[in-house]
Amino acid sequence: MKLRLKIPALWWLAAFLPAVSPLAVAQDAPPEEPRRYFRYSLSTIDDVTVYSGLQVPLPIVLNQFLVEPTLTFRYKPVWSFSTSLIGVADTYTDSFTQLRVKEAYAGASAGNFDITVGRRMVRWGTGYAFTATGVLDPPRMPTNPTDRLNLNEGRDMVKADFVHGSSALTAAWSTAALAPASADLHDTTAFRYNVLVHGFDTSLIAGDDRGGDAFGGFTFTRVFGEAWEIHGEAAWREHEAILGGAKYTTTNGITFIGEFFTPPNIPYFQETSTPLNGRQHYLFLTAGKSRLRELPGWKQWDLSVSTVANLNDLSYTAIIDATRRFGNHFSSYLHMEVPAGNSRSEYGATPFTAATSVGIRFQL
């Protein structure tokens, strides 16, 4: 009698298991990516800069109000479009408003190939405050390497990428037709080969500026554990330019960055209005910490101190940055620059003794 009861039970169990298994597999399968993806953001900055000891006949207060909307749209994994605009209202010697296009590009992907057309910001150089190989990058400003007002704009280009395993090949052509005349840009053709070799992220870069010079370069980045990183660049454009740097993060979250940069004395690398004699040598040092302490009232603070120095004329600029966050959307900041040096030196010739910027940022 007991045997008769067990046999039907086994039949029911055998019939039920095949029905359950596909259900379990379906529940374990990752969800499919949406066919359409849309994301937008909005940020505003109200910035006031006060110049102390101004040595030229200009107002001592500069006020800027910036609005930056950004949106990204993707259809399937193939098509994409992204744009980032910035509206600037400036009150200084005169009041004016302008609209800048930071980025506006469309992209298509097919297998290992990606094609991008439009204005795009890229970062080929590995340097934090300087770069020798960032031929298509926005310009680096050593006293403001993070671009705190988000004023950098991309280059207008057609770019194609081919990725295979741990290597990638990029070909880009950039036009200067839509760039401001003050930017002093040329039509640029550039190639970049990136590959990971024994833990070193390396790149070979080559190209040519129309009406200018051909150039070539090499970059590398290497991370050691969770604390150390080294990076470097070497480039040739009429003469050699060398950059070397390192980053170290302590166990309590303090980050130190140091860079040494020596460019040749040619117009491409000379960003100052004062003519410089011969090859220059620069040093950049910074120490900073996000979330000063994991305690209420402290973890909302970020603080960093930096200095950039010209080792030839011994002039320098000291920089202090402090940020205080209020919730998820608001933050305030302080940015101060104090130049020092002989009046005929690079940083000593700065026409003020200090520039102090304070601002409020809103992000949505």
List PLM regions with ranges.
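Detector for outer-membrane/organellar transmembrane beta-barrel domains
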Residues: 33-34, 197, 221-309
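Outer-membrane beta-barrel architecture
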Residues: 68-70, 104-107, 159-161, 192-194, ...
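Outer membrane beta-barrel
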Residues: 72-176, 341
